[in-house]
Amino acid sequence: MSKMRVYEYAKKNNVPSKDVIHKLKEMNIEVTNHMATLEPEVVEKLDHTYNKKNERPQASAPKEKQKAPVKPKNYVDDFDDEDEEVVKTKVPKKKSANKKKEGKKHDLQLQQQEKKIFHQQKKKIKGKAKAKEQQPVQQEQPMKKEKELPKKITFEGTLTVAELAKKLGREPSEIIKKLFMLGVMATINQELDKDAIELICSDYGVEVEEKVVIDETNFESIEIVDDPEDLVERPPVVTIMGHVDHGKTTLLDSIRHSKVTEQEAGGITQHIGAYQVTVNDKKITFLDTPGHEAFTTMRARGAQVTDIVVLVVAADDGVMPQTVEAINHAKAANVPIIVAINKMDKPDANPDRVMQELMEYNLIPEEWGGDTIFCKLSAKTGEGIDNLLEMILLVSEMEELKANPNRRATGTVIEAKLDKGRGPVATLLVQAGTLHVGDPIVVGCTYGRVRAMVNDTGRRVKEAGPSTPVEITGLHEVPQAGDRFMVFEDEKKARQIGEARAQKQLMEQRNMKARVSLDDLFEQIKQGEMKELNIIVKADVQGSVEALVAALQKIEVEGVRVKIIHAAVGAITESDILLATTSNAIVIGFNVRPDANAKRVAESEKVDIRLHRIIYKVIEEIEAAMKGMLDPEYEEKVIGQAEVRQTFKVSKVGTIAGCYVTDGKITRDSKVRLIRQGIVVYEGEIDSLKRFKDDVKEVMQGYECGLTIKNFNDIKEGDVIEAYIMQEVERK
């Protein structure tokens, strides 16, 4: 016996589908509707049930059971049979044949009409039967259970009615009804404020929590407080600073046992490099900051990310200008300093002289009663290197350097470049958390996904913990050295924040105050009531520098003072321009020229450079510019007089004075004073000036006009109206 559906079985046994489904449920057989399939065993059980029920009626009328259902007459078949008979029994008589043909035609039309009516009736009966079968099944479907209410919901800012309904697991119409009962007319897409959300949720007994929205675009200012239990010890980040050619890179080369110096042009470090070494099973991260004075800003950045500064001073050379700069940067960053006295292998080495010179900068050796660690070493021979590394680890332990590796990574860009094969490449120093390959990241004003990570030895790594320098690829643009980076939960969020930061930077650049120049000093430098002109002086010899500084400081103009922020011997360099950029200063060159880099940066940063060969020309130019900075002096200039000959009072306008211009002219934008019998009654501005019915800008001598004075109506015949302007006068 084959499978059959519920409705087929019901039709076969002449019973409703509802009855069959009911019987199946009594037999503990689950079916959903009349289209459900019945297995042969189930059909046998149903047959057994229905046979028992119908035993008596079958015995009394056995013939009825065998009777086939009455089929509708097939008029088409009958017609075919008749047609055959007509063909077989042809009659030679023409008249009788014609009559038969006409009758056949008439019968055919009747049969077609009856057949059409029959099919229409059949369709109606089938449709009604189907509807009857489906109706009870639909009624028996179980009702939807309401979802359980959540104990607590969270939201940011606002929620629409649809969003709130989704969070509560209710229909939006139900929420709209509740709001209506509370007196709030709302639609499905209407936003609800915090009060409305709390009212609805309290009605359902659900707790509400509002998430505080943090502006993640400014992630540098976000301070994440870690649990002390999550903090682990991290390697110290050490910056090696010092004067050019004092042996910084050679020292690092000795520590790493690699030839870094040979790869660099001229033996001078071109970029900040980051390297990691292992000492006594502990790691130390080194940043090699360029020592040349042209890289002032790079050195300042190096001090910001470092934990310990190793100040390299040559034993045979002593303290130099760049040494002092390095000390100032380290102190500004509040970073402990370890002094490494290098080149001890040289015959003219004098470490005591170096110690004596450094005492002037408050770096006193421990052996002389101070707290600064001094290490005597030779980077060339390797003498004293181990002692220096031990001192670095000792200071690191004292500083208790710790970080949480189990959170999203943050840190700083050490350097960045555009590689022809790999695209934007950035060297990052991870300062907190762990950076993984595949992390969505925002770096400065760009974003991307960490595609690959390479450590300082050139090996690919999958993750980098705190104080680890790595080179990454996968950014959309090249970031700036010194930019901060942060990892986000997904690339979509990283892209949004990166684009928002780029847009913000663009707006800041547009609104950035223009650099000061001697041509527009009056417009550019105003800080409250205090006027100040910042100047950087560069000259060919020290005598010229001193003479120029003294002459500039003697310039006396009321309310303005000269501030020399930097004065030195030598050509105008890139670092001078960068200093002028940050301090909004003018650069004056005396018998010197700017180098190519300085010119390029000055053009891009709009820094004003003035070059002179004669000192008094410098003084004259600066003095003239400073005088222009002062608030201008004004004097009054009378431009005309008019006599009031008649007055008219108009409601909502006031008193109109009919005047005759006796001298000069009266202008629409001039100020006026009303004089009555030689006494000034009122000073103010003209509200309107007309000739006849037309507004005019001015009325010349000998013409009549009508005018009103702003906020004044006490005008009488015979009054004199004097027009004047305030004219700027050059300060002497």
From Swiss-Prot:
Q: Give the InterPro entries listed for this entry.
A: EF-G-like_DII, EFTu-like_2, IF2_II, IF2_N, P-loop_NTPase, Small_GTP-bd, T_Tr_GTP-bd_dom, TF_IF2_bacterial-like
Renumbered residue ranges of the record's region G2: 267-271
What ranges does the record give for the region G4, renumbered to this chain? 342-345
Signal sequence: where? none
Map out region (G3) in residue numbers.
288-291
Q: Where in the cell is it found?
A: Cytoplasm
Q: Where is this region: G5?
A: 378-380
Looking up Pfam families in the UniProt record yields: EF-G_D2 (PF22042), GTP_EFTU (PF00009), GTP_EFTU_D2 (PF03144), IF-2 (PF11987), IF2_N (PF04760)
Output the Gene Ontology terms for molecular function. Answer: GTP binding; GTPase activity; translation initiation factor activity
The family assignment reads: Belongs to the TRAFAC class translation factor GTPase superfamily. Classic translation factor GTPase family. IF-2 subfamily.
Its protein name is Translation initiation factor IF-2
